Amino acid sequence: MTEYKLVVVGAGGVGKSALTIQLIQNHFVDEYDPTIEDSYRKQVVIDGETCLLDILDTAGQEEYSAMRDQYMRTGEGFLCVFAINNTKSFEDIHHYREQIKRVKDSEDVPMVLVGNKCDLPTRTVDTKQAQDLARSFGIPFIETSAKTRQGVDDAFYTLVREIRKHKEKMSKEGKKKKKKSKTKCILM
């Protein structure tokens, strides 16, 4: 069974834990209890493949930012979460993305942009803004509500699909490099 290491990042209070718990336990946690770091595992079937999701729910609070490098090193894919009613959390996405790319030492890291709390009427981040940002990053965008469960499975499953695509691409690039290295050279 394939295991996928997913990391949920974003500012404090955007609903990272609520999204994760909704996926794992099928219920909504409405009280806010800042996370330091929690790990969850769930077996699911995505596109006919049984897989194990190893999900790391991270601290959004700035005082825990030193821990970020460590979990970013081990993660294969990242859900970058902001709240649609919190413009600052949307602006913070740039910072998280840059940190992930720096730690992974790669421009090409599987990510999904997630706009959470779409059940709330007090939107300050327009859907088009988020779609444009995701497009500029070359990553998918999904709106979710941990409360109503809208888009929750889709967000995590899309990230798994992004990781699969990335692994396939890396595998093909590896094969191309091997083919190139088999060329013969004759010295006279």
UniProtKB/Swiss-Prot annotation:
Region (Disordered): 167-188
EC number per UniProt: 3.6.5.2
Lipid group attachment sites (S-farnesyl cysteine): C185
Sample GO molecular function, one term: GDP binding
Reactions performed catalytically: GTP + H2O = GDP + phosphate + H(+)
Pfam families: Ras
Family of the protein in this entry: Belongs to the small GTPase superfamily. Ras family.
Cited function: Ras proteins bind GDP/GTP and possess intrinsic GTPase activity. Plays an important role in the regulation of cell proliferation.
Name listed for the protein in its UniProt record: GTPase KRas
Organism (species): Oryzias latipes (Japanese rice fish)
